[in-house]
Amino acid sequence: MIRAITFKDIAAVQQIAKISWKDTYKDIIPDDIQQLFLDKAYSSTMLAKRMEKTIFLLAEYENEPVGFANFTYVDEDGDAELTAIYVLPDFQQIGLGKKLLFAGLKEMPKGRQLFVYVESENNGARIFYERYGFECLEEFDEYFEGHPLSTAKYVYLLNN
């Protein structure tokens, strides 16, 4: 089941983020950099703000939280961003990521395009987005919490 995240879900989201990040980025981002980011981006205060200002969805499997997705609302230009989509490793490949993605897309009927930024080495995510119609626009180098990364920018056309 996919539903909106509530304040009661904050601890579960923090746990999903921690486990998913360790699994996803184990060979891409050093552990200390991951922890630094998780402490900031997934603090209770930050998650509460994200719940108020964004589309924040939870995936449940047999009534247990196992994944989440976070989208910005469509801006005045018709653009939105998928800022996070994570599913616990044991629950990947069963369609929950797809359900989270399409549930978020339903929330932006008047949008023009949805952007997502993916670490270039995150092949699983790249395959996932390309499977559902995202197109890679560019790749660029940047620093993430002081750590050099190569990032791929993808776009999905919302009204084509």
Regions found by a protein language model. Give the residues of each.
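Acetyl-CoA-dependent GNAT
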Residues: 4-10, 14-92, 101-107, 140-142, ...
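Conserved GNAT acetyl-CoA-binding A-motif
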Residues: 101, 108-118
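Conserved active-site tyrosine of GNAT-family acetyltransferases
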Residues: 128-129, 134
